[in-house]
């Protein structure tokens, strides 16, 4: 007797019968925006409550030894949560979303809908020097992905729903709907069309509205424009953009080096936790501005005017009360932030690089303006404005996302009057870093593996194909010791123009090219004289079962082969790829991507 369908199956069946997929996509976009804003609210609530509980009683004018303890405790608790509750890797949130889009048909695991919120909340609340944005983007994307899986959406709609989740996360956490939209286009590289624009906008607006309801109207950054932009500050804006480009390059290279170092300690988790925790705690003790996301320190730079304000930036540190050392403090914090972020994630914490890029950008912009004004390198430039522009510049460089940098900072602060200088800084920053790095910090790992989805439709189609979608397994392997007479009967049963030659372990030794032996297979007097190993040839190329599809296409172009064998790391034959099927699949994906 067949089992009765469950409630979800009945709901999906009803939807397929009464609601079109297009209409359902719009409904899901609204739901995704709502849930993403709720997730962002919970994360910020967790972080805020933990930080209030731990640090509200600290005397601002003196250092506190508890800064040496809290970060290590937070990372340890996060590690326990991930190891015993989640039991999965949840690091590199935005990179994980890009990977899912490129290689997993936009499918993210169910626990990603909540696990990053809890893990990053603990990490940041206890002082981890990372951001909440990447975990929320992963959460929003996972909500979109899982809803898409429940309602059995096609591959293209799945990508769109993941994009809705990511855009809603950014829009909700920053109350910046336009920034959420352009983030999805620039960073996740979801193609914009009329079919995709409306769902993403619905998610962004919904998330923003519910964030206002849940968290009030207060903006994340408190900025009031008191010194309007003037044309004679253009040279300073250009130089700030170049400076931000090099700061972004330093951030990316240092992060990559630190990640590589901690990866070497993967087999020693407690050593990694202790080592990274000590580095993080020491840096936070010396520079308390590194505690958590650090947005409170950035806000002081945005509205500070007096020595008392600058002392607040250096509160709880050994620098407190020495406002003459502000430039040194700002420079050291800018330099060490990347190590604090790397130590947090490398030792077992959970968080992103979105907030650190904003933090470093704000401090770098203030540092640039203060040095410029101290040494009178040109006309006076307002430090608060350049703090803001530095945030946009470094974010643009790190993420290769100039529109996101421009619109996010403008929406966050209401600083639309600074649109022109923001554009100048972001353009110069992107031009500078593009000389050294062609991909964002999120895309760099995937680009090296050939798994990055881009706006280039040909490259995107190749990336989306995936090895498993084109591998064929209807082959007839033969033994190298098989007599030629029996080979003839195997040829008669084969639908291909080649036969793979394998040993008893299944390892590929060569191939029999039927077109090459056709002239002798009907000579019966040779049937006992020759064996397969005397007739086999080496294939013109061999494909690995984990080879990037760009390399697969390249080998077909170089060899002009009709088929190429696919083997695993031990050389065991796993199947073959035919040129005909490869290009047929490619053309179908291009057609699907081009359709509205």
Ranges and model annotations:
Residues 1-464, 468-469, 473-474, 478-509, ...:
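Alpha-helical transmembrane segments and immediately membrane-proximal extracytoplasmic
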Residues 509-517, 576-583:
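Short hydrophobic beta-strand motif reused across regulatory alpha/beta modules
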Residues 478-495, 502, 521-524, 542-569, ...:
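The conserved cystathionine-beta-synthase
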Residues 203, 425, 472, 514, ...:
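ATP/adenylate-binding site constellation spanning eukaryotic-like Ser/Thr protein kinases
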Residues 474-478, 534, 539-542:
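Structural signal for short hydrophobic segments within the conserved structured cores
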């Amino acid at each position: 007797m067949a089992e009765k369908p469950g409630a979800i199956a009945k709901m999906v069946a009803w939807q397929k019968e009464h609601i079109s997929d297009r209409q359902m996509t719009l409904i899901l976009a609204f739901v995704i925006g709502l849930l993403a804003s709720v997730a962002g609210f919970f994360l910020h609530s967790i972080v805020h409550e933990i930080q209030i509980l731990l640090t509200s009683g600290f005397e601002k004018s003196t250092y506190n030894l508890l800064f040496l303890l809290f970060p290590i405790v937070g990372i340890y608790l996060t590690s326990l949560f991930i190891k015993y509750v989640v039991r999965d890797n949840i690091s590199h949130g935005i990179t994980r979303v890009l990977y899912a889009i490129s290689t997993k048909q936009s499918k993210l695991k169910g626990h990603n809908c909540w696990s990053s919120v809890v893990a990053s909340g603990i990490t940041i609340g206890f002082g981890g020097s990372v951001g909440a944005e990447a975990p929320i983007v992963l959460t929003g994307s996972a909500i979109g992905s899982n809803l898409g899986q429940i309602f059995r959406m096609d591959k293209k709609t799945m990508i769109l729903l993941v994009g809705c989740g990511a855009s809603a996360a950014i829009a909700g956490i920053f109350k910046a709907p336009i920034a959420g939209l352009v983030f999805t286009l620039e960073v996740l590289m979801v193609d914009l069309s009329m079919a995709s624009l409306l769902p993403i906008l619905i998610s962004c607006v919904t998330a923003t509205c519910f964030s206002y309801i849940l968290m009030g109207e207060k903006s994340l950054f408190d900025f009031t424009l008191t010194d309007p932009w003037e044309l004679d500050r253009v040279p300073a804006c250009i130089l700030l953009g170049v400076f931000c480009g090099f700061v972004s390059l330093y951030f990316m290279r240092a992060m990559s080096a630190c990640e590589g170092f901690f990866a070497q300690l993967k087999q020693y988790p407690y050593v990694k936790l202790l080592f990274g925790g000590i580095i993080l705690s020491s840096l936070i003790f010396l520079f308390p501005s590194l505690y958590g996301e650090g947005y409170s320190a950035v806000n002081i730079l945005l509205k500070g005017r007096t020595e008392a304000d600058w002392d607040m930036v250096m509160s709880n540190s050994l620098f407190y009360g020495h406002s003459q050392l502000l430039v040194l403090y700002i420079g050291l914090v800018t330099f060490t932030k990347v190590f604090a972020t790397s130590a947090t994630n490398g030792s077992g914490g959970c968080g992103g690089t979105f907030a650190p890029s904003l933090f470093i950008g704000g401090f770098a912009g203030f540092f640039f303006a203060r040095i410029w004004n101290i040494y009178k390198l040109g006309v006076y430039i307002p430090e608060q404005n350049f703090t803001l522009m530095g945030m946009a510049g470094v974010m643009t460089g790190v993420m290769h996302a100039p529109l996101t940098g421009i619109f996010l900072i403008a929406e966050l602060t209401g600083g639309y009057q600074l649109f022109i200088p923001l554009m100048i800084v972001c353009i110069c920053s992107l031009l500078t870093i593009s000389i050294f790095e062609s991909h964002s910090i999120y895309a760099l790992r995937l680009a090296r593996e050939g798994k990055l989805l881009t706006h280039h439709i040909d490259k995107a189609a190749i990336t989306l194909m995936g090895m498993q979608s084109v591998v064929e397994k209807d082959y007839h392997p033969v033994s190298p010791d098989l007599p030629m007479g029996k080979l003839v009967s195997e040829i008669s049963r084969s639908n291909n123009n080649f036969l793979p030659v394998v040993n008893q372990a299944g390892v590929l030794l060569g191939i029999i090219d039927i077109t090459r032996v056709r002239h002798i297979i009907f000579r019966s007097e040779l049937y006992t004289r020759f064996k397969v190993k005397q007739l086999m040839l080496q294939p013109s190329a061999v494909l690995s079962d984990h080879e990037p599809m760009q390399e697969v296409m390249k080998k077909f172009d170089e060899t002009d082969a009709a088929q190429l064998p696919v083997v695993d790391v031990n050389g065991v034959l796993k199947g073959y790829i035919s040129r005909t099927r490869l290009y047929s699949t490619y053309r179908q994906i291009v057609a699907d991507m081009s359709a509205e």
